[in-house]
Amino acid sequence: MAKRVQLVLKEDILSLGKDGDVVEVAPGYARNFLLPHGKALPVTPAVMKQVEHRRAKQKEHEAALKDEALAFETALKTIGRFTVKKQVGDDGVLFGTVTNGDIAEAIEKATEKEIDRRTISVPEVHAIGQYKVQIKLHHEVTAEINLEVVSY
C-alpha cells in the first residue's frame, strides 16, 4: 500500500476539507490533480506559517463582519417598524403578496443600506396587518423586525 501525502488545501474541496486544512491524500491524487490544478500545496514550515497568517486574517475579517451585523441589527431595532404599501381589495386581502424584495426595499429606504433579499424570511402575507420578519444578517446574527402592511 502506498504512503499517503500530506497537503495544505488552498481552497474548499467538498470531499476533502476547507481552505487551510491539512489533509492526507493518495500520492496519485496529489500529483495528478491537486498540485497541478493549484488546489493544494505540500506541507512545509513556510506554507504552515502562511496558513496561520491567513487564518488570523480570516478570523479578524469574520469578527469585523459580525460586529457590522450586530450594529445593523441595533439600527433595525431602533427604527422599530417598517411599512410596505400594497393594493388591497374590498375585503382587506392583498392583490398578490408581500415579497422579500418589497421588504428589502422598505429597509433600504429607511436605513440607506442595501440588504440581500434572500436573507429575509417572510411569513405568508396575504392581508393588511402587522407581521414579524426574520433577517439573517450573519451566520450568528439574526434580526427580527416588525413589518406593517398597509393599503394605498
UniProtKB/Swiss-Prot annotation:
SUPFAM superfamilies: L9 N-domain-like, Ribosomal protein L9 C-domain. Binds to the 23S rRNA. Disulfide bonds: none annotated. One of its GO terms (molecular function) is rRNA binding. Belongs to the bacterial ribosomal protein bL9 family. Pfam families: Ribosomal_L9_C, Ribosomal_L9_N. One of its GO terms (biological process) is translation. Keywords: Ribonucleoprotein, Ribosomal protein, RNA-binding, rRNA-binding. One of its GO terms (cellular component) is ribosome. This is Large ribosomal subunit protein bL9. NCBIfam families: L9.
